[in-house]
Amino acid sequence: MQDQYILALDQGTTSSRAMLFDRLGNIVSTAQKEFQQIYPRPGWVEHDPQEIWSTQAGVAAEAVTRAGMNGTSIAAIGITNQRETTIVWDRETGHPIYNAIVWQDRRTADFCDQLKEQGLEEKVRAKTGLPIDSYFSATKIRWILDNVEGAREKARQGRLAFGTVDSWLVWNFTKGGLHVTDVTNASRTMLFNIHSLKWDDELLEALDIPRSMLPEVRASSEVYGPTKTTVFASKIPLAGIAGDQHAALFGQMCTESGMVKNTYGTGCFLVMNTGDKPIESKNNLVTTIAWQIGDQINYALEGSIFIGGAVVQWLRDGLGIIKNAAEIETLARSVSHSDGVYLVPAFAGLGAPHWNARARGTLFGVTRGTSSAHIARAALDSIAYQSLDVLKAMEADSGIRIGELRVDGGACANNLLMQFQADILGVDAVRPKVAETTALGAAYLAGLAVGYWKDVDELQSQWKLDRRFTPALPHAEVKQCLDGWQRAIRAAKAWADTP
């Protein structure tokens, strides 16, 4: 197997990507293609499932061709994907009966309120680890059944299949031969019992969703079956599946209980490995499955922040104080601190651990001496402060003191932000050499399943440090910063609560 590689497919919200990895975890080739975002009404977000498939199949073939290889050079394929996005298709024709309803879509918010009024919230959280929210797949499936003509009847006949994006890709790669998902994607549907590791009949009944629609749930690392499409001339084992944040946690080698990663993207996703036991959150975090390898289940706590790197886009597009995202570090570095200015970027409400949908963006501490540099500094600081709030909630829920924070995503390239994150956390922020941790995690899961890599210990030895940011800010200054942030958060909530 010396000349073989692992192909990772990373199907995201705005683009489909493919990457080839070698035995040392290095990227050999990559391909990417964006696809259309569909907004039929305010608050609705859809994708064309056929375009998801065609772009993903296209970049898979392109990545292999670019490397001068063919299918025989690929030892296995791993899939990672945007989570919760819901596709329902006809088993007989293989055609979707409606567009994919994307995780961001809010059309079922009123129905979620009805479920809460029926007293289901506590039961759903106890079984699935999730709150009732339109973010997750369950109410999206229900909407399709209720609003697409003939869907209920076809579902009763057993003709309809539901899947998250991973299931849809596997179905197409195997020409309808496999209807499967993995435990991580199942754990984001609001229908999967994370304790029994089975679809929950009580929740299916409450939501009036036929069990016959659902995929078989498998481990995150196992051989599901071979490809059967013309994308590759040879049959390649499909051998790893994980939702994007779960794959990133594994790609960061956060394999021990208490290890945490933060992905700094448009928003921020913080995930903590909690070992073999699910921890029920008392601090508005989500309990989820990190991954399953063999019979071993790892659980996780997750907190999502709505506005992370997006605050930099706002400085560029909304305020016009920078021309491109790369300028923010230079501008923010031109002052030694924010001079008492705090930005709470609640442009779409506050996410974990506050969960305040009515909160709006607020800027505090502004004086005549406030400059664009101070606002830029406050914007960067806000990403670190919000991450701190989630990490403190994780520590409170788990009883584990975080030893270090592993970082990835676009904004982790900003050294000023990473240093401030370490300063206010009081622990090191650690950036890996391979920034593509999501795709790498999918590759690792697939490679383990086919013996390309021996075990997790071998993978641990591959994790390479790019830079370690060590806390350097004096304790008194950290306290002053955090006191100011807490005042700003309280004021933002007060603004939201004032009619």
Curated annotation (Swiss-Prot):
Pathway: Polyol metabolism; glycerol degradation via glycerol kinase pathway; sn-glycerol 3-phosphate from glycerol: step 1/1. ATP binds at T13, T14, S15, T266, G309, Q313, G410. It comes from Paraburkholderia phytofirmans (strain DSM 17436 / LMG 22146 / PsJN). Coiled coil: none annotated. This is Glycerol kinase. Pfam families: FGGY_C (PF02782), FGGY_N (PF00370). Belongs to the FGGY kinase family. Its EC number is 2.7.1.30. Key enzyme in the regulation of glycerol uptake and metabolism. Catalyzes the phosphorylation of glycerol to yield sn-glycerol 3-phosphate. Gene3D superfamilies: 3.30.420.40. Inhibited by fructose 1,6-bisphosphate (FBP). It is an enzyme of class 2 (transferase). The gene is glpK. GO terms for biological process: glycerol catabolic process; glycerol metabolic process; glycerol-3-phosphate metabolic process. Sn-glycerol 3-phosphate binds at T13, R83, E84, Y135, D244. One of its GO terms (cellular component) is cytosol. Glycerol binds at R83, E84, Y135, D244, Q245. It catalyses: glycerol + ATP = sn-glycerol 3-phosphate + ADP + H(+). GO terms for molecular function: ATP binding; glycerol kinase activity.
